[in-house]
Amino acid sequence: MSIEIPAGLTELLQGFTVEVLRHQPADLLEFALQHFTRLQQENERKGTARFGHEGRTWGDLGAAAGGGTPSKGVNFAEEPMQSDSEDGEEEEAAPADAGAFNAPVINRFTRRASVCAEAYNPDEEEDDAESRIIHPKTDDQRNRLQEACKDILLFKNLDPEQMSQVLDAMFEKLVKDGEHVIDQGDDGDNFYVIDRGTFDIYVKCDGVGRCVGNYDNRGSFGELALMYNTPRAATITATSPGALWGLDRVTFRRIIVKNNAKKRKMYESFIESLPFLKSLEFSERLKVVDVIGTKVYNDGEQIIAQGDSADSFFIVESGEVKITMKRKGKSEVEENGAVEIARCSRGQYFGELALVTNKPRAASAHAIGTVKCLAMDVQAFERLLGPCMEIMKRNIATYEEQLVALFGTNMDIVEPTA
């Protein structure tokens, strides 16, 4: 007697298993009820529920648990949103002439299944499970490495001893113009921090490819492929001679992944409570937690400055932030020539306007008292918050109304036309 397994059942159960291993729920039955109810609600909301009596299958519902319908990012057109790299390693489409490498069929659910296969639990791993790796460095090399790593969000929450271990374990990799640092479809072996040089990001999807972004002497890539045991979903190619700092998979998982697991426990509930992130799927919200960093500002300290280029997006975790804008020739201005236009408190966000419109910062932000913010860099913002973009774009109209009331003009903050 042969029993036919319904299409998609395996994927559906794998997805559930991953979530159970990740959260370790005390009440498994209640967790299962919430998990499958959430899947059903997400599919109904999108109008893509795939089960019933009209040729629909639970398999399509299972696929939705791993990523669902592709969404558009901020600076990308007509490409599916990927979310397996902090700085674009796993972005979207690649140049049509990028036939030198073959792209795998990218499905976020099947990639997540490999997490279950590896069965890595950072809560159970002993600190000394792996011997410490040390690559000797000259004073000049270590100084350059520290400078390259100082703005890497993944390292922000490491204590001094953990950071020292990371620096010891990193090794220098020199690259030539045209060299492929990582290739789409390969297994993740190292996390890379750019010391110097320029690099292009190529992605091939559905037979159509293009360059989707680039790095200019700064940035990092490759971390989420190591965190989730997923294949590379992009090719990073050097466009000039340069140098990278690499961190091996073992050290990365022992230090970064374990530290990130602690951070995830701290911030999961906070991220899920934010209304503007409701359009993200559960797995996408978890990846937001993975890429955010924490920044603390003292009273009066400037967080962003009007006219500066945009590199980060901020969510207020605690405290209050004052948003001001300079406008000459107005009597209402403060001594520094700026008018207060808004205040942001816990759960509210700022800094998104420049990222949405691709223009310099339209306003400044200062801390009122001690302020703690969650920060996300521009690459992660573009990659992970695509589904939230319509909400943020709708806010532009509100900003314009406020500016017209204050200055008699919208200050030309609207999104530029292409």
Curated annotation (Swiss-Prot):
Binding locations of 3',5'-cyclic AMP 1: 154-275
Main location class: cytoplasm
Binding residues for 3',5'-cyclic AMP 2: 276-418
Segments of this protein annotated with the region Disordered: 48-96
Places the protein is found: Cytoplasm; Cell membrane
Keywords, ordered alphabetically: cAMP, cAMP-binding, Cell membrane, Cytoplasm, Membrane, Nucleotide-binding, Phosphoprotein, Repeat
Lineage: superkingdom: Eukaryota
GO biological process: adenylate cyclase-activating G protein-coupled receptor signaling pathway; fatty acid metabolic process; intracellular signal transduction; learning; modulation of chemical synaptic transmission; negative regulation of cAMP/PKA signal transduction; response to antipsychotic drug
Phosphoserine, modified sites: 83, 85, 114
Gene Ontology CC: cAMP-dependent protein kinase complex; centrosome; ciliary base; cytoplasm; cytosol; dendritic shaft; dendritic spine; extracellular exosome
Transmembrane segment boundaries: none
PTM field: Phosphorylated by the activated catalytic chain.
Modified residues (Phosphothreonine): 69
Segments of skewed composition (Basic and acidic residues): 48-57
Protein name: cAMP-dependent protein kinase type II-beta regulatory subunit
Organism: Homo sapiens (Human)
This protein's encoding gene: PRKAR2B
